[in-house]
């Protein structure tokens, strides 16, 4: 919904392009990216939580991911901050239970979040 709204408000914006299709797209977007990004995000959050409170750490993390994703497609950052706000919040909340859960839960939610777009990319003829 958020991406559709941004694209409606700013139709000149271009979304990210993925130079892959089929099983590679599914693996990259549903397995690799969520695990790799969660490992990076969680490590940064663990450092931030030593320096600032949980709210500031979550906001800083999601803002950093928005900037990082904007490098690939400028408008993508406007869209991606929200999911990373959720992923970062999940990490901080589940960290109270266990470090393994703090990494596993956001990675699983991220994978599910990426599943529908990954299926669309994987099934498109041009990737």
Question: What role is predicted for each listed range?
Answer:
Residues 3-4, 26-127:
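Transmembrane helix-loop-helix hairpins at the membrane interface
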Residues 8-19, 126-127:
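Membrane-interface helix termini and inter-helical loops of multi-pass transporters
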Residues 16-29:
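Loop-to-helix transition at the N-terminal end of transmembrane alpha-helices
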